[in-house]
């Protein structure tokens, strides 16, 4: 895996914690049987070759986005840096929302981002559904030990009895039922003898706890739904807050790294692990949960509900629309894996919520592409320029560096002819002050070509300038002796009209015009940027091989890539990745 140049180090509060754990030998004696399992299995294992174990645990109910990329980079990066292993685990405990399509897409996205979960001869690709038998066995053990009970209240009754931040909850009438009675009901739940929502398994903790999450949280609920992996084998499914610590412990995770919304769940996480370890079900040392602030970007929404609405209502062209914050959208836009890793490395890992300006993501891809992207010329808004004193039918070769940062890349060659395409913005009939490009009587250099002097222009019936005339100075060709004898203040790019390659170019910009589209009571759809996609018919420098994924810096314009979906050899389609400079004011 090739990484971008090392960025300035961003703070990461987790690093000192891990270093302290390793220095104190907190995981010394930790055993690993080569696969996840309970204490009895791990006791048969060898000392764990991984110094630490982390995990990236997506739910397979959608496509990964830039926020997930941060979590991926944090978990895989810490494991890499400290001689550990990062697991890819699918938290597939909600059968009504999960699909194999998303599993496949997540695997592809994590691989594309540059990370691998194979280590020490193990695949380290896991599914929560692989642990359903363990979870159920542990649930029975908790019931028998008096730590859990089956509640027959409705969801509304449970909610009403939970209390508030200032008032304690009320005990369920089923809280003190005998353990064998709860065990019987739990087995009936598993055997499909009760309808959805009729019974739940709850932990017996403390209904007066100041932390509402410890007021007998629900662990299992009845759901007669087909699971994408287990089919109809189960009709009870674990709640995430119960499954999460069990999964971590079975996999020997040392540092369970979550986003801040799970901070209030940590006491329940610790309670579950402690009770199951006391019962001999889970091996010590136990995992510890740490929370960091999720990545929030200006001009972006990452809510699955809102992204789905954008797709379903046609505001974007699917999940891989180049304006979407999904990893597939960013990939199609032309963002490289190394640019996204670079961006994530430049953002701090902290416990304080903040918003990162979108310009930092754009700058990361500029910094990543600048040293490697070949240069070329494109004209996006073409205007004909005729060199009136240049012979008709004549063509000569001009040359330019493929990449000024890499002399080994060599030069590119392209023809100069009588008729050229230039940008509309490079001519003014009546120029403003400090305008140094073409206007009647002014002299400019055609970059890599000749110096020319504007002699006239032609308008159509509507008054639009459709052609500019100029004369060239024969002794001023770039790279020849005496070429700099004529001093000019303006340089403009061009392509030969007879040789240029026609292409459709999508000029993508930020999807939202508001820096905080999901803030407060805003209608996020009202914040959409009406200019987030503009399509133009452009002319490209000849010699460009428009294969999907090929990327260039078009001089003066920005970075562009060949669209992976719509481009064809006979009809190239390109996407603008990013402009050369930030054109937005800081949010």
UniProtKB/Swiss-Prot annotation:
Span(s) of short sequence motif 'KMSKS' region: 301-305
Gene3D superfamilies named among the record's database cross-references: HUPs, Ribosomal Protein L25, Chain P
GO annotation, cellular component aspect: cytosol
Disulfide bonds: none
Binding site for ATP: 59-61, 65-71, 259, 294-295
Subunit structure, interactors included: Monomer.
Listed PANTHER family: GLUTAMATE--TRNA LIGASE, GLUTAMINE-TRNA LIGASE
Name this protein carries in UniProt: Glutamine--tRNA ligase
Recorded name of the encoding gene: glnS
């Amino acid at each position: 895996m090739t990484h971008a140049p090392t960025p300035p180090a961003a703070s990461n509060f987790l690093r000192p914690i891990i270093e302290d754990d390793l220095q104190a030998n907190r995981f010394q004696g930790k055993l690993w049987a080569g696969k996840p399992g309970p204490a009895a299995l791990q006791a048969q294992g060898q000392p764990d070759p991984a110094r630490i174990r982390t995990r990236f645990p997506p739910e397979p109910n959608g496509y990964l986005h830039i926020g997930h990329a941060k979590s991926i980079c944090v978990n895989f990066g810490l494991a890499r840096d400290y001689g550990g292993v990062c697991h890819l685990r699918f938290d597939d405990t909600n059968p009504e929302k999960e699909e194999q399509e998303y599993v496949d897409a997540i695997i592809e996205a994590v691989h594309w981002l540059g990370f691998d979960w194979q280590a020490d001869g193990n695949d380290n690709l896991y599914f929560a559904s692989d642990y359903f038998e363990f979870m159920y066995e542990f649930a029975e053990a908790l019931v028998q030990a008096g730590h859990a009970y089956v509640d027959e209240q409705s969801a509304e009754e449970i909610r009403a009895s939970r209390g508030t931040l200032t008032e304690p909850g009320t005990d369920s009438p089923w809280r003190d039922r005998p353990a064998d009675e709860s065990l019987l009901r739990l087995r009936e739940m598993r055997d499909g003898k009760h309808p959805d929502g009729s019974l739940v398994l709850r932990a017996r903790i403390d209904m007066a706890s100041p932390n509402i999450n410890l007021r007998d949280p629900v662990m299992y609920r009845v759901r007669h739904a087909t699971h994408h992996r287990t089919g109809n084998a189960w009709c009870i499914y674990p709640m995430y807050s119960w499954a999460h610590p069990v999964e971590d412990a079975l996999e020997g995770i040392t540092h369970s790294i979550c986003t801040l919304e799970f901070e209030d769940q940590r006491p329940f996480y610790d309670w579950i692990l402690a009770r199951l370890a006391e019962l001999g079900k889970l091996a010590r040392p136990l995992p510890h949960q740490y929370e960091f602030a999720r990545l929030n970007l200006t001009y972006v929404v990452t809510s699955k509900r809102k992204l789905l609405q954008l797709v379903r209502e046609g505001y974007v062209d699917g999940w891989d629309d180049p304006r979407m914050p999904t990893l597939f959208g960013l990939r199609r836009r032309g963002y490289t894996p190394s640019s996204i890793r670079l961006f994530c490395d430049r953002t701090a890992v902290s416990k304080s919520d903040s918003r990162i300006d979108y310009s930092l993501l754009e700058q990361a891809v500029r910094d990543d592409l600048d040293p490697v992207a070949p240069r070329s010329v494109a004209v996006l808004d073409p205007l004909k320029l005729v060199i009136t004193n240049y012979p008709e039918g004549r063509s000569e070769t001009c040359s330019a560096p493929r990449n000024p940062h890499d002399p080994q890349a060599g030069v590119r060659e392209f023809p100069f002819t009588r008729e050229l395409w230039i940008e509309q913005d490079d001519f003014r009939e009546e120029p403003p002050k400090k305008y140094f490009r073409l206007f009647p009587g002014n002299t400019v250099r055609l970059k890599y070509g000749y110096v020319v002097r504007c002699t006239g222009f032609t308008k159509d019936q509507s008054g639009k300038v459709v052609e500019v005339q100029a004369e060239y100075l024969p002794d001023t060709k770039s790279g020849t002796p005496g070429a700099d004898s004529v001093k000019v203040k303006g340089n403009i790019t061009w392509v030969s009209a007879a040789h240029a390659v026609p292409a459709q170019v999508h000029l993508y910009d930020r999807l939202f015009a508001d820096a905080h589209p999901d803030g407060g009571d805003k209608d996020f759809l009202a914040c959409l940027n009406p200019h987030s996609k503009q399509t133009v018919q452009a002319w490209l420098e000849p010699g460009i091989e428009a294969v999907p994924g090929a990327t260039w810096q078009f001089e003066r314009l920005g970075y562009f890539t060949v669209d992976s979906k719509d481009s064809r050899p006979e009809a190239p389609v390109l996407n603008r990745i990013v402009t050369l400079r930030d054109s937005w004011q800081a949010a």
